[in-house]
């Protein structure tokens, strides 16, 4: 059985999170970076950690990681942002930091979990008060959701349909349908497990 890492009980939650951030910034190992980012994304589930994660600029660390070439880092980073963006202060930070293009870029990931987290994050960011961010429901995003709404993946299909129904106007959906009919271009669907042929 693996042992838990030894943590100084006097360090506390903030100290532990700071140690994770420092390890992420200082390590050269991609495996270590992936593990640390996964841990930070898991800590982002707990609203009790939000203040510490903001203080340690973990939201910016997640946003920066969306530009990495390592798909695993991107998956954990968008997962962490997804966990954090239900909170108003975190949502505002992501929007003000210019995170939307990075999150929208995750829609073209070949990894389904990354795409699911990106769609959910966009839904959190699209909640009331986000009218000043029209890129959330821009034509390319709506076209992408239309493509996802016919995905073989039930989770992706359902999430895209919710996005289209709850966050897009009927005229936006109609325009996207019309434009898609005239174009073969689009964001590719993420890879899903194909049924095995006998």
Swiss-Prot record:
This is Armadillo repeat-containing protein 7. The lineage of its organism: Eukaryota, Metazoa, Chordata, Craniata, Vertebrata. GO terms for cellular component: spliceosomal complex. As a component of the minor spliceosome, involved in the splicing of U12-type introns in pre-mRNAs. Keywords: mRNA processing, mRNA splicing, Phosphoprotein, Repeat, Spliceosome. InterPro entries: ARM-like, ARM-type_fold, Armadillo, ARMC7. The keyword Repeat applies. One of its GO terms (biological process) is RNA splicing. The keyword rRNA-binding does not apply. ARM repeats lie at residues 57-99, 100-140. The modification Phosphoserine is found at residue 169. It comes from the Eukaryota. Disulfide bonds: none annotated. It comes from Mus musculus. Component of the minor spliceosome. Within this complex, interacts with RBM48.
